[in-house]
Each structure stands twice: as C-alpha cells, then as structure tokens.
A protein has these predicted regions:
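N-terminal leader/linker segments that initiate helical-solenoid repeat arrays
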Residues: 8-67
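Hydrophobic face of amphipathic alpha-helices that form TPR/SEL1-like repeat modules
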Residues: 54-61, 91-96, 116-130, 162-169, ...
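Structural signature of tandem alpha-helical TPR/SEL1-like repeats
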Residues: 32-34, 61-74, 94-101, 127-147, ...
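Short helix-capping/linker turns of helical repeat alpha-solenoids
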Residues: 46-48, 60-62, 83-86, 108-112, ...
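Fold-core signature of tandem repeat domains
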Residues: 44, 106, 117, 152, ...
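Alpha-helical tetratricopeptide repeat
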Residues: 18-22, 37, 49-53, 86-90, ...
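Terminal, low-structured helical/coil segments at or just beyond the last alpha-helical repeat
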Residues: 217-240
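Canonical positions in the second alpha-helix
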Residues: 43, 78-79, 104-105, 150-151, ...
Length: 240
C-alpha cells in the first residue's frame, strides 16, 4: 500500500467506508473505493454485523455473502424493526429487492435509498411516458427531483450528480444550467469521477459557466486520473 493510500485509510471513518462501498465503484476514485472495501472487509472479519451485511450485498463471492448475511441478518432486522434505522432498511431492501423497504429507507433520508428511489421513479416515468399525461409526468419527475435534492442536501456525491442532471434537463424543475454546473462541481470536489467529467463538459460547452478550455482539460484529466489513468495522474502532478 502506498503512503497516500495509507493516509487515506487512516482518514476514512467506518461510516465513510460503508457509504463509499454502497455508492458503487463509479462514485469515487479507484483508490478510494479500494480503501473503503479494505476497511469494511477488515471490520466484517472482526464480526461487526453491519459491515458483514454490507460485504454480503456487495461482494461477488457467493459463499462469503451467504456466510456474512446469515451471521448478521438478525441484527440488521432488529435495527430496522426496533430502531427504525434507515441504513438497515436499505440493506434489507437490497437483499430482497423490496420496493416497500426501499421507500422506508428513503423516508428515513438514507442517501443510497433516496438516489435509488429517485432513479427508479424517473425510469418508470419515461417507460410509461406514452401513457402518462404531461401534468402527471411533471408530478412524477418532481418526486425524483425531491429525492435527489434530499440526498444532495446531505452532501452525497451521487445526489449531486442526479440533482445536476435534473437541472440540466429540466426534470422536475425549471432547466437551470448554472445550478447543474454547481451540482456537478460539488460532486467533482467530493471526488466523484462522473462529476469531474461533467464539470469538464460544462467548461467545454459553456453550460452554466463561461467556456474555458484550460479548466475543461484540467477536470477531464482529473476524471481520468480518478479512474486509475496513470498518464492523466502524471499530467496533473507535473502541472502543480
């Protein structure tokens, strides 16, 4: 492990690591995701139920998933049923693919549930677009916008990406390119590679911000470096 990765490991809290792992690899840099997984795996191996269940729903190792989920399921169910823990509701919704549990988690402001529910609603809206009136479509899209707004209000990178996309396209709100740019920039500054790409595109095409070829290149390189592109990382180091 490099010194930089070691520093990141000590800086990352358990809650941060769980959030990174549940937000999927594309929502953070390759290094951040790897460190988050190592952090959660280490705590799961110590017998911590929450971390065990998180590994269970995110690993490709079916045997390990069964072992950890069988070991921790009772505790997660207790946290959901008796503590009304939003993260516990979300984890149970992942295991059973249960929309009711997902809504319960979103009602408790779990950011992963808010993003998932908002995305699900918006997809269904467009799947049914031909059979939905314009007014009904606007109401449906507003529900997605509200979900993403609540996630972004908690400084969640995926929430910023989703909210920025709503502003960019006018989904559930008036189109506002300046707000879209600010959302994408917030995601980028939080380390989201897609946010970096979007900021680069905004500077390239002048969406919500004055065109700037140099800044477009800079953010594009940051997005590539975050995904593990060594040439881009070298370019950024030499630019300092």
């Amino acid at each position: 492990m490099t010194f930089a990765a070691l520093s990141l490991l000590f800086a990352m809290t358990s809650a941060d690591a769980v959030a990174v792992l549940l937000n999927s690899p594309g929502a953070s840099s390759v290094r951040t995701f790897e460190v988050a997984r190592e952090t959660v795996e280490r705590e799961a191996a110590k017998g911590k139920p929450l971390q065990q269940f998180v590994i269970g729903v995110t690993t490709d190792d079916k045997a390990l998933a069964k072992k950890y989920m069988d070991s921790s399921r009772e505790r997660i169910r207790f946290l959901a049923a008796h503590k009304d823990n939003p993260l516990a509701w979300y984890l149970l919704s992942l295991e059973s693919n249960d929309l009711k549990l997902l809504r319960r988690a979103a009602a408790g402001n779990n950011v992963q549930a808010l993003n998932a529910l908002g995305t699900l609603v918006i997809r269904e809206a467009f799947d049914k677009k031909n059979g939905v009136s314009t007014n009904d479509l606007e109401v449906i899209l507003k529900k997605s916008f509200d979900c993403f707004s609540r996630a972004a209000a908690q400084r969640d990178p995926n929430g910023f990406i989703n909210l920025g996309t709503c502003y960019l396209r006018g989904f559930g709100c008036e189109q506002d390119l300046a707000m879209a740019f600010e959302c994408f920039k917030s995601a980028a500054e939080a380390g989201h590679p897609e946010g970096m790409d979007n900021v680069s595109a905004c500077y390239q095409f002048g969406h919500g911000v004055a065109p700037d070829a140099e800044l477009s290149l800079f953010w594009g390189m940051r997005g590539r470096a975050a995904r593990g592109d060594e040439a881009a990382a070298k370019w950024l180091r030499e630019r300092k």
